[in-house]
Amino acid sequence: MTTTHILGYPRIGEKRELKFALEKYWRGEIDQAALKQVGSQIRQKNWALQKEAGLDFVTAGDFAWYDHVLTTTLLLGHVPKRHSHGFPDLDTLFRVGRGQSQNACGCGTGSAASDMTKWFNTNYHYIVPEFSSNDTFNVSWPQLFEEVNEALQAGHDVKPVLLGPISYLYLGKEVEEGFDRLTLLPRLLTAYQAILSKLAKQGVQWVQIDEPILALELEPRWQEAFKLAYQVIRGDVKLLLTTYFDSVLDTLDKIVELPVDGLHVDISAAPAQLETIVNRLPSDWVLSAGVINGRNVWRADLSAILARLQPVKTLLGERLWVASSCSLLHSPVDLDLEGDLSAETRSWFAFAKQKVTEVALLGRALEGDAAAILACDTYSQPIVARKSSHIVNKASVQTRINNITAALAERSAPYIERAHHQAEVLGLPFLPTTTIGSFPQTGEIRTERSAYRQGKLSEQEYVQALKGHIADAVKRQEALGLDVLVHGEAERNDMVEYFAENLAGFQTTQFGWVQSYGSRCVKPAIVVADIEREKPITVEWSTYAQSLTSKQMKGMLTGPVTILCWTFPREDISRQEIAQQLALALRDEVADLQDAGINIIQIDEPAIREGLPLKKRDHQTYLDWAVQAFKISAGSARPETQIHTHMCYSEFNEIIESVAALDADVITIETSRSNMELLKAFEEFNYPNEIGPGVYDIHSPNIPAQAWIEDLLRKAAEKIPAQRLWVNPDCGLKTRNWPEVEAALTNMVNAAKALRAEWQA
């Protein structure tokens, strides 16, 4: 028998039931019992789906109220002291993830949420564990055991999933100086022993223990920690050591020495590792082959996968398991919900529910089931047809791609010359003030957008409504005294989806939601074909806004790499080529904007760093083509057209050369929370172009004082020549309300004016 399973299933519910229940609970509209009932219903449905599809195990422990790393933190009794008030409960978990205001806690100070960061190179976020020297661990949070029991009582064969001890430590951070979190390992392992012992007593036979950091380039001390850890926690349950997102060949020497019972590897992300792993697999281990991609939306080529695995099946027999490459939480829930897709387009996709069916069908085919083998061949036919589809391949796009030259990615003059031209044309003051692009998406804007999409507003009525919001934004900015204005992006629901809806080559969905963190879900567009701009996208809005003011108006574009990173890409061509196609489309938009009289154009690239591959040796190749894509986008700009970009990172050191290579005339960055410390990277590199360090944190409702902003600007001027500084917030203002925005920007503009007077005296 070929054992079939998945590494996890989406926890949000097919129509985001968990999101809505969580938000009702946080607003006080339902109690904990009602919230838990929603969670139970989602789990029961997920398990039933896996069983009905024919999987040998259902996966328990993949459900999380906020984030699975945070769930592990509570399971281990490792709650930060500022959030620990007696025995942990759901509210404890939410305090760690979301923080608590002083009014809610009654303590007069509130408690800050733990940090949140990206889960490897996905668009999912996790709550970062915090470690200090006096930490203890105790198994006090019953969620995992309750859910295992729940699944057992429903008659399922259960395989719990547990984040492994080394990855848990690695993914956290020390909160005291001079302390190494790896020294906590012996204490942590005692807790893991207790967890595995308890699962064994519940009748569990296999535990999926996730150690995704084994796909990274680990320092020797972290590699050595695995052997100690697994010698200690080895007990009465079988352990499936689970890795994903990249190859584990770098750490395979250490892996095969571990006292575990099986290994899961991501064959989808790193297909070349399969043969080596099969040859080196210990004779008593199972191999779980992650061949169904858990991170995409594409139908699997089951016929090709079957052909690849049949020799492995011959070698390993029942020791071969078939699985998803990673948890399916990175995929939308159910393709069956999509009512607006054409039959041809639908045949290209598989969401989480369909991927479960793919795993089960592949397992039956590997057992020699003739009907299943035939079904695999039939299932793969749309993939073959898609390769020659006129919808997918466009000769006009391919011609442009083939004609890309180095000159296409260069401005027509170096920065020093451009800066001179721009100073003459733009006429901006010393320390120019601006914002990053978006203004509040008010309830009125959202209502109008919804009415338009439902056909309750005509296109003409909707356009007029949006123009009213743009005019209001321009009027407010002029009253505030900003130097460079923006139109406010009232027409955009999302900075990526907006461009996906207006570029040929994308497919958007109705219910293609995936979890980002907590209750936040995103609905990435899908790149289905060659990308082309068929008509101008932003020109009408920007030129209308420019017609309302004599001040400079910024055109606002989302950059090619960010659009790529925040969508589901094609897999029949390289990510580099998709980025090039996007860059060419945006290049045309830049040309049209400047021809229409827009002299400043911002090309946002907040995701360039997020797109870095997991292994450092692969970074430069990625950065080279990412930089090229940006420069192709900006390459149509004349010397007098000023190109801005915006990035929000917490770490620039490792990519500062590539940031400089973008050759943007102005870069705006997120720096206020770091007290301008992030500028050190630019100072040490001697960054040559202009910089707008964010002077206040837009994620906080707090209004920054003028003196505080002045102090930040003084610190910035110690690192960057004041003549090259801009004054702006950290990020867009979409999520704030107008009173907050106007109060903060008033102080920001006044701070700039005060320092102009002082420094130019």
UniProtKB/Swiss-Prot annotation:
Report whether Glycoprotein shows up as a keyword of the record.
no
From the record, what ranges are coiled-coil? none
* Metabolic or biological pathway, per its Swiss-Prot or TrEMBL entry: Amino-acid biosynthesis; L-methionine biosynthesis via de novo pathway; L-methionine from L-homocysteine (MetE route): step 1/1
The UniProt keywords, alphabetically, are: Amino-acid biosynthesis, Metal-binding, Methionine biosynthesis, Methyltransferase, Repeat, Transferase, Zinc
Q: Where does 5-methyltetrahydropteroyltri-L-glutamate bind?
A: 16-19, 118, 520-521, 566, 610
Cross-referenced CDD domains, in alphabetical order? Answer: CIMS_C_terminal_like, CIMS_N_terminal_like
The organism sits in which domain of life? Answer: Bacteria
Cofactor(s) the record lists? Zn(2+)
Show the disulfide pairing.
none
Instruction: List residues binding L-methionine.
Output: 436-438, 489, 604
Top-level enzyme category: transferase
GO terms, molecular function: 5-methyltetrahydropteroyltriglutamate-homocysteine S-methyltransferase activity; zinc ion binding
EC numbers listed for it are 2.1.1.14
The active-site annotation reads: 699 (proton donor)
Q: Which InterPro entries match?
A: Cbl-indep_Met_Synth_N, Cobalamin-indep_Met_synthase, Met_Synth_C/arc, UROD/MetE-like_sf
Q: Which reaction(s) does its UniProt entry say it catalyses?
A: 5-methyltetrahydropteroyltri-L-glutamate + L-homocysteine = tetrahydropteroyltri-L-glutamate + L-methionine
Write out the residues that bind L-homocysteine: 436-438, 489, 604
* Residues bound to Zn(2+): 646, 648, 670, 731
Cofactor binding note from Swiss-Prot or TrEMBL: Binds 1 zinc ion per subunit.
BP-aspect Gene Ontology terms? methionine biosynthetic process; methylation
Family of the protein in this entry: Belongs to the vitamin-B12 independent methionine synthase family.
General function of this protein:
Catalyzes the transfer of a methyl group from 5-methyltetrahydrofolate to homocysteine resulting in methionine formation.
Which protein, by its recorded name, is this?
A: 5-methyltetrahydropteroyltriglutamate--homocysteine methyltransferase
- Annotated organism of origin: Vibrio cholerae serotype O1 (strain ATCC 39315 / El Tor Inaba N16961)
